[in-house]
UniProtKB/Swiss-Prot annotation:
Listed InterPro entries: DUF520, UPF0234-like_C, UPF0234_N, YajQ-like_sf
Stored CDD domains: YajQ_like
GO MF entries: nucleotide binding
Membership in a protein family: Belongs to the YajQ family.
Entry function: Nucleotide-binding protein.
Species of provenance: Pelobacter propionicus (strain DSM 2379 / NBRC 103807 / OttBd1)
Stated name of the protein: Nucleotide-binding protein Ppro_3093
Xref: Pfam families: DUF520
GO cellular component, one term: cytosol
UniProt KW Oxidoreductase keyword: no
């Protein structure tokens, strides 16, 4: 039976490159002169530190533009709350989502079941496997999911006959 997997993966090397480009741009931009704004990367997250909320928004805009230029979807980012930091500064943690959560997996399965396509979907760890009798149904499921806005970056991989 033909099948494919729905995954949500982000290339962390591209994230690292985007963060480095954003750091370089912030260090060279005129509107950030004298500012202590900084971006640091952790394992699966990016920490942004800025003087105030306005500068924080500007730093995040720079970071998002670099992500888009490197073909990293903004949907893969989850923004933490803005917290105060020492010296009157503000900090925000932006986590990079890897894998599909159980809730999103259930949402994807519900969308597929509502469509009445002749396919079955099941959650496997951090991905969703979709199987069907013929390839046309599977391609219909892919088109259906691409058309829906599920607030998650999806890739369709491992298409098998």
């Amino acid at each position: 039976m033909p099948s494919f997997d729905i995954v949500s993966k982000v290339d962390m090397q591209e994230v690292d490159n985007a963060v480095n480009q954003a750091v370089k741009e912030i260090s060279q931009r005129y509107d950030f002169k004298g500012s202590k704004s900084e971006i640091s990367q952790e394992k699966d997250a990016v920490r942004v530190l800025a003087d105030d909320d306005f500068k924080l928004k500007a730093v995040i805009d720079v970071l998002q533009s670099k992500f888009l230029k490197r073909n990293i979807s903004i949907k893969a980012l989850q923004y933490g709350k803005v917290e105060p930091a020492s010296g009157g500064m503000v900090r925000q943690l932006i986590s990079v989502q890897q894998g599909i959560s159980k809730e999103k997996g259930k949402e994807i399965i519900a969308v597929i079941k509502e469509s009445k396509l002749k396919v079955q979907a099941q959650i496997q760890d951090d991905q969703v496997r979709v199987t069907g009798k013929n390839r046309d149904d599977l391609q219909g499921a892919i088109q259906l999911l691409k058309g829906k806005d599920l607030d998650i970056e999806m890739q369709f991989v491992n298409f098998r006959e």
